[in-house]
Amino acid sequence: MIASAADVLAFWREAGEDKWFEKDTAFDDAIRTRFLETYEAAVAGRLTDWEATRETALALVIVLDQFPRNMFRGSARTFWADPLARGVADRAIARGFDAETPVAERAFFYLPFEHSEMLADQER
């Protein structure tokens, strides 16, 4: 089942900063079980309507940029959606969504550029 953007954000916020950047097999498994179908829909371009608002765009960036780092940890698949995440983040930033986002979550609009192999992205 494809989760809603609200479900993605509720899960991510409930997990909190302690889980966001730590290696935790149980957390990785929970993301994979709950959100793999949502990730696959996003990669297939079926969630482009999530770009419409700050909250839904934030959820889409998390699905495309953060979730694969947990779901596919240690495999090449971890990075497959990076170009898509950068595109969503770029359009969200152009619309000012980052500036409207609380500081604790704002970084998620910037991380796709940090993860990029291209120096120009990292210097943004």
Protein language model features and the residues they cover:
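Intrinsically disordered, low-complexity activation-like regions
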Residues: 1-75, 79-124
